[in-house]
Regions:
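Carbohydrate-active catalytic/glycan-binding domains of CAZyme proteins
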Residues: 1-337
């Protein structure tokens, strides 16, 4: 796909991306209905593509389940299994108000699949109100299975809000395995504040995590709102993040205008910029000013020798306006060949 050394350049993936199709639609098209916030995992051996998603229907029926889809070509997906927040609440013994981001990886030692869920375990379901989103209590929970189709068994909380900087939110992870090491970039917010940063954690087994803290960006402190979401790849310079860079909150929703890539220097706790550019919509399904609602994946497809990028897109026609309970989100696929 190119003549460059090392990891295929994020600049080329970005420049060559072409809109392919809508992958998933929300459960309905009323404002406040979404799908997405998931993870694309490709099983090269079995020729299968697995995609997770969380459906949402407004402020009261927030992220009410995790859904797992399967495809044979990376473009046409069928629902295989799901787990509701009520079922999850029963299995972990704690009320789950909402499910958001999910991450799906396969553990190299056990061969089991790890499904990480961002769950709101606040005492009351108040964060559906755009004025009260910072009253939520988000942590990350792990489920384990022999196959992505389930059954999924609860393993326990793996990222708790036990640091000052993530006491309000420890969620919305980007988790991948590089050289046998789990690497995680996640959303960290101190309780009682509106300051959101991207934190870094590592693990040898995906269950016991070491939090390294809030990395600098090119040696400087992160902006007051700085959220990364995407994928982590093995590069010649070290682990490489590719995905969205979110700097804005619009009517309670973290909305994205930028695609970026960074070298993750976990030893020096720094993110070194490789590339950053404005994401300009190439489809009629993306809002012209805020095309993406935080979430995306950038994944190499070894089955078809191409790069797949999916985004959770803010629909410009069905949405009343960008915002927590006023927009409609779909999952879109871009292909770089």
């Amino acid at each position: 796909m190119g003549v460059w050394n090392g990891l295929y350049p994020s600049q080329a993936i970005f420049a060559r991306r072409r809109f392919r199709r809508v992958l998933l639609n929300p459960p309905c098209f009323d404002p406040g209905s979404w799908c997405g916030a998931g993870k694309l995992w490709i099983d090269e051996c079995d020729g299968e593509y697995w995609l997770t998603s969380r459906p949402r229907m407004g402020s009261e029926k927030r992220g009410y389940a995790v859904e797992i889809y399967r495809s044979r070509n990376g473009e046409d997906y069928s629902l295989v299994t799901w787990l509701t927040k009520e079922e999850l609440s029963e299995s972990i013994g704690k009320i789950v108000q909402s499910i958001e981001n999910q991450q799906l990886v396969r553990d190299p030692l056990s061969g089991k699949y790890h499904l990480y869920l961002s769950i709101d375990i606040a005492e009351r379901n108040v964060a559906g109100d755009e004025r009260r989103i910072f009253e939520s209590k988000w942590e990350t929970f792990l489920l384990v299975a022999d196959d992505p189709s389930g059954p999924w068994k609860p393993e326990g909380f793996v990222l708790r809000g036990d640091k000052d900087y993530d006491s309000g939110e420890a969620r919305d992870c980007t988790i991948d395995i590089v050289d046998g090491r789990y690497i995680c970039l996640y959303k960290a917010r101190k309780a009682g504040t509106r300051v959101v940063h991207t934190a870094l954690a590592v693990s040898s087994d995906g269950k016991n995590w070491m939090k390294l803290g809030i990395p600098t960006v090119d040696g400087e402190h992160q902006p007051e709102y700085f959220l990364l979401n995407g994928s982590i790849h093995a590069g010649s310079l070290g682990p490489i993040f590719m995905g969205t860079k979110t700097l804005d909150v619009v009517n309670g929703a973290a909305l994205t205008r930028y695609f970026a890539s960074y070298v993750i220097d976990y030893r020096s706790l720094n993110l070194e910029t490789i590339f950053s550019a404005e994401w300009k919509p190439s489809s009629r399904y993306e809002h012209p000013q805020y095309p993406i609602h935080t979430y995306c994946n950038v994944v190499y497809d070894p089955i078809s020798d191409r790069w797949l990028t999916w985004i959770e897109a803010v629909d410009p026609i069905l949405s009343r306006e960008p915002g927590l309970n006023t927009e409609v989100d779909r999952v879109l696929l871009y292909v770089s060949e």
